[in-house]
UniProtKB/Swiss-Prot annotation:
A GO-annotated cellular component: small ribosomal subunit
Tree of life domain: Bacteria
Family assignment from sequence similarity: Belongs to the universal ribosomal protein uS12 family.
Subunit-structure text: Part of the 30S ribosomal subunit. Contacts proteins S8 and S17. May interact with IF1 in the 30S initiation complex.
InterPro entries (alphabetical): NA-bd_OB-fold (IPR012340), Ribosomal_uS12 (IPR006032), Ribosomal_uS12_bac (IPR005679)
Record protein name field: Small ribosomal subunit protein uS12
Keywords, sorted A to Z: Methylation, Ribonucleoprotein, Ribosomal protein, RNA-binding, rRNA-binding, tRNA-binding
One Pfam family here: Ribosom_S12_S23
GO molecular function, one term: rRNA binding
Modification sites for 3-methylthioaspartic acid: D89
Organism: Saccharopolyspora erythraea (strain ATCC 11635 / DSM 40517 / JCM 4748 / NBRC 13426 / NCIMB 8594 / NRRL 2338)
Biological role: With S4 and S5 plays an important role in translational accuracy.
Encoding gene per record: rpsL
Length: 124
């Protein structure tokens, strides 16, 4: 416990809140270049081959980003747009790639939740 005199001299220091998406540097999204596209397996009760990519962002930081939806056209040197948002069963994956922007195509034959996957409205 500090004395009154110590508080007068130094004062209290505010706690600094740590952001969950540090690599975006305060931006809502950031552009980047894929350095590696691969699959990885999720944590214990789940089983799958989740599609992820290592992305070098314009902020200079390299992050692992999840590729949502079924099927993708990404490969090394693809330009992608990255947003925040973790994948609960993939440790260390705290970003997601935005489908339908830059070099990333939208999901084919997507009928519902199309805006999340960059899918165009089907011609009726």
């Amino acid at each position: 416990m500090p004395t009154i005199q110590q508080l007068v001299r130094k004062g209290r220091q505010d706690k600094v809140a740590k952001t969950k998406t540090a690599a975006l540097k305060g931006s809502p999204q950031r552009r980047g270049v894929c350095t590696r596209v691969y699959t990885t397996t999720p944590k214990k009760p789940n089983s799958a081959l989740r599609k992820v990519a290592r992305v070098k962002l314009t902020s200079g930081i390299e992050v692992t980003a999840y590729i949502p939806g079924e099927g993708h056209n990404l490969q090394e040197h693809s330009i992608v747009l990255v947003r925040g948002g973790r994948v609960k069963d993939l440790p260390g994956v705290r970003y997601k790639i935005i489908r339908g922007s830059a070099d990333t195509q939208g999901v084919k034959n997507r009928k519902q939740a199309r805006s999340r996957y960059g899918a165009k409205k089907e011609k009726s």
